[in-house]
Amino acid sequence: MKFIIILFTLISIVTAAQRIYNKDYSYYGCNSYCDKASDQEDACGYYDDDVSYQDYYGCLCGNEIFLSNLKSCDCFTSIIASVSKSVCSKATEDSDWGYYDDSTSSIMDFFTADNTPASNTGMTTQTDGAINDNQNTGSKTSSGAANYLTSFSIGTFFVFVLGLI
């Protein structure tokens, strides 16, 4: 009985750690598109204090290659997000985003850890060639590894419950 409880706990911890690793990895170093998008953010002044908030986003807004790389930087889900409206709205003075602070944030931060857009404000999604404003598609599918880990966790839970009976 104690063995089953320890085994269940160990498997749950490993599964949670793997999910955290996968979600972090999905936008940084996942594929060459992610690396290129990150490099282009750096080139626009992500780490440069002399680059203003609007200049930074203006640089990204006009960079079609950056936007293309960002759209292709998606390894674990099938979400297709067009972030150009968000980036360009941050580049204008009269945007709804305003000046909350003087620091810049990575465009990669538009997504939360679960790969869904962090906010519907200014976010557009693209489906079948049409652009639908302010819709959050969320995560459509996940990788085989994530499905395996989820199934494994559920199976482990059932083994634990059966062990209690």
UniProtKB/Swiss-Prot annotation:
Similarity comment: family membership: Belongs to the IHD1 family.
Signal peptide: 1-16
Propeptide span(s): 144-165
Gene Ontology CC entries for this record: extracellular region; side of membrane
Role noted for this protein: Probable GPI-anchored cell wall protein that may be involved in cell wall organization, hyphal growth, as well as in virulence.
Native species: Candida albicans (strain SC5314 / ATCC MYA-2876) (Yeast)
Keywords: Cell wall, Glycoprotein, GPI-anchor, Lipoprotein, Membrane, Secreted, Signal, Virulence
Record's bilayer topology term: Lipid-anchor; GPI-anchor
Lipidation sites (GPI-anchor amidated serine): S143
PTM info: The GPI-anchor is attached to the protein in the endoplasmic reticulum and serves to target the protein to the cell surface. There, the glucosamine-inositol phospholipid moiety is cleaved off and the GPI-modified mannoprotein is covalently attached via its lipidless GPI glycan remnant to the 1,6-beta-glucan of the outer cell wall layer.
Subcellular location: Secreted, Cell wall; Membrane
UniProt protein name: Probable cell wall protein PGA15
Description of what induces expression: Up-regulated upon milbemycin A3 oxim derivative (A3Ox) treatment. Expression is also regulated by CWT1.
